[in-house]
Regions:
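An active-site-proximal "capping" alpha-helix that borders the catalytic cofactor pocket
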Residues: 106-109, 211-232
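Active-site-proximal gating segments in proteases and membrane effectors
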Residues: 66, 123-131, 203, 223-327, ...
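Catalytic Zn2+-binding segment of zinc metalloproteases
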Residues: 164-183
């Protein structure tokens, strides 16, 4: 049998079955030498763990007048490529020889969620503990350096899984569209580029409502990858108000109690109004919140962690994606039948319309 020298092998891949019948993929690449286990959730579709409020809010968004035209304009202006170029020139691209530990955590998460193609990962200099995922044809993830300084390895992996969840669920195209629309609204007082009268306040509210609900789906991806609700909780807690110096003085049980207290506030209808106003600000895109409050997210993910749906996914019973891996969300009208009266989409649409009418009334009065 001929002998092969590894240093002479380029892009050479083999598949072997061990005695224990566990399948490993050996990727002997001159640039990346590692043993890669098969994905934890092989072929999983983002729809398998997508939160129903995410689906409903997207349905509402797509039904708001002006969405289709905005989508066509977004594609025309190609928002995706400039952002990728920016980070290629202004951030550090993570790889086997650049932030090797972070890359290992990233590869594990990519494997577990069976994301293909592998997104590009960047670290950018920013002390705020934040991250985001963008791109459809060439997806990428950006971690602020503050994430690396605040979190431990398990928690960094949780953040990476969260962003991969956005990619897996097909959120990134809508996120980019929202960012582009908001930048147009913020930069141009008199709409140009054929967008005059297009980006209504109702459409803006619908974008932000969907954006917040999309986070709930990605939190589920975090739990699937970490398989540890405590890691998810500690990550949320640290991003909410973590500290290196006083890390020993924070308590997860107290954070959970705070989450429960926050939910109790809804018993007073006036508190619900205040929450709505806090999320939506004055109606300006710069004052609206893109994420749910961490204690609210904590409630939803703890609820799912004890669900039968989560248990079945862990057992391997879940919806599979196509050959491409991640599920893309195309820019088109939904094919699902219209919801029944008083469904969640109807409620959101009614709130958006009422709020837009009030904003218009105040503008006329002013």
């Amino acid at each position: 049998m001929p002998k092969y020298k590894c240093q002479n092998v380029t892009n050479f891949q083999r598949s072997i079955i061990s005695a224990s019948c566990s399948l490993l993929v050996i990727n002997l690449d001159t640039n990346r030498n590692y043993y890669q286990a098969m994905p934890t959730y092989t072929g999983i579709s983002g729809e398998a763990f997508r939160h129903p409020l995410d689906r409903q809010a997207e349905q509402t968004l797509r039904s708001v007048p002006g969405f289709d035209l905005l989508a066509s304009k977004f594609i025309e202006f190609l928002y995706e490529r400039p952002q990728l170029i920016y980070h290629t020139g202004n951030s550090i691209q993570v790889g086997p020889r650049q932030y090797a530990t972070i890359y290992r955590l990233f590869r594990e998460s990519v494997r577990d969620l069976d994301v293909f193609p592998e997104p590009v990962l960047f670290v950018t200099q920013n002390p705020i503990a934040n991250s985001y995922a963008l791109g459809q044809e060439k997806p990428y993830i950006v971690l602020n350096s503050g994430i690396l300084d605040l979190l431990n390895e398990s928690e960094i992996r949780a953040v990476l899984a969260h962003e991969l969840g956005h990619i897996k669920c097909g959120h990134t195209i809508l996120i980019q569209m929202a960012m582009w629309a908001m930048s147009v609204v913020s930069a141009i007082s008199e709409m140009t580029f054929g967008l005059g009268g297009l980006i209504s306040s109702g459409l803006i509210y619908a974008f932000f409502e969907w954006r917040r609900k999309a986070e709930l789906s990605s939190d589920r991806a975090t739990l699937l990858v970490t398989d540890d609700i405590d890691t998810v909780i500690s990550t949320m807690m640290k991003i909410s108000g973590g500290s290196h110096a006083y890390a020993h003085e924070v308590s997860m049980p107290e954070f959970i109690r705070q989450s429960e207290d926050y939910r109790e506030l809804d018993k007073d209808n006036l508190n619900q109004v205040y929450k709505f106003l806090l999320y939506n600000g004055s109606g300006s895109p710069t004052s609206m919140l893109s994420h749910p409050f961490p204690v609210d997210r904590l409630h939803y993910i703890r609820d799912w962690a004890g669900s039968e749906e989560y248990r079945q996914i862990r057992l391997g019973n879940y919806k599979r994606a196509g050959a491409s891996g991640a599920v893309d969300v195309e820019v088109e009208e939904p094919t699902n039948p219209p919801p029944k009266p008083e469904s969640e989409p109807d409620r959101l649409r009614r709130q958006i319309e009422d709020l837009q009418a009030e904003v218009d009334r105040m503008k006329r009065k002013g």
